[in-house]
Amino acid sequence: MSSSENICVVIPAFREAGRIGAVVRAVRAQGLAVVVVDDGSPDATGAEAAAAGATVLRHATNRGKGAALHTAYACAREHGYDAVITMDGDGQHDPADLPALLAAARTTGAPVDVGNRMADAAAMPRVRRWTNRGMSWLLGRVMRQQVPDTQCGFRYYRLAVLPTQPPGSTRYAAESELLLDLAARGVPIASAPVRTIYRDEQSKINPVVDTLRFLGMMLRRAVRRR
C-alpha cells in the first residue's frame, strides 16, 4: 500500500447493540472512516453505530456476513476508497491493532493482509483453536500458499483485487472462499499478528454448523473444477 491510499474500515454487524458503538468510536478516534452494514438486526445496532460516527447501511433481513461484506465493499468503491480494513463489530478485534495492520501492509506491499491470532492463541476457546488450525491447513494446501489464520476477519484488502460479483457463500464461509479466489488469481496474501479479545458472550459462530458450511463450500469448488 502507499501512504496516499484512501482507506476506510468496514464492519458487518448483527445484533451488536451495546458493543458496536465503542468499536466505531475507537476506530474514528484514529481518523478512519467507518462503514457499518447492519445485517437485519432486530436491536439498536444501526442506531448506535450511526450515533458513534459510522456510515450505516441496512439489510432488511439477515443475509449473512459474506453478503454484508459485499455490500460494504460496494459502498467503499462508490465513495472512492482505495482499500478497506474489515473488522468484527463485537469488540473481539482490537482497534489499537489498526496501525500495526496498516504498517504490515506498507511493509509487505501485498494487496491483502490477513490478521494472525495464532501466535498468541492461548485465550482462544479450544474448539475454535482446533477448527481454525484445521481449516487454515486445508485452505493452505488448496491455495498453495500458507496463511497462518485464514479464519481471522481482521483484514486489509486493496479494493482493486476484490471481485465485484456477490460471493457464492453468503455467511462465514465467504471469507475463506474469497481467499481461495484471490489465490487462484495469483494475488499475494500476507499476514500480520493481531490480538483478539474474548469475552463471556456466546459467539455467533457455530463450530459444527459453520465447519460443515466451510466443507460444503470446499466440496462445491472441487466439483466445479472437475
What are these model-predicted stretches?
Residues 61-78, 95-172, 198-209, 213-219:
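Acceptor/aglycone-binding surface of glycosyltransferases and processive sugar-polymer synthases
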Residues 6-8, 177:
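Cell-envelope/extracellular polymer assembly enzymes that use nucleotide-activated donors
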Residues 8-12, 58:
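Short hydrophobic beta-strand elements that form part
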Residues 38-47, 91:
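A conserved acidic beta->alpha catalytic loop
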Residues 18-22, 43-52:
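Acidic helix N-cap motif at the loop->helix transition within catalytic regions
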Residues 145-146, 167-170, 179-196:
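Catalytic donor-sugar/metal-binding loop of nucleotide-sugar-dependent glycosyltransferases
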Residues 81-92:
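Short beta-strand-to-loop acidic/aromatic patch adjacent to the donor-nucleotide binding site
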Residues 13-29:
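Short, well-formed alpha-helical segments that are part of the catalytic scaffolds
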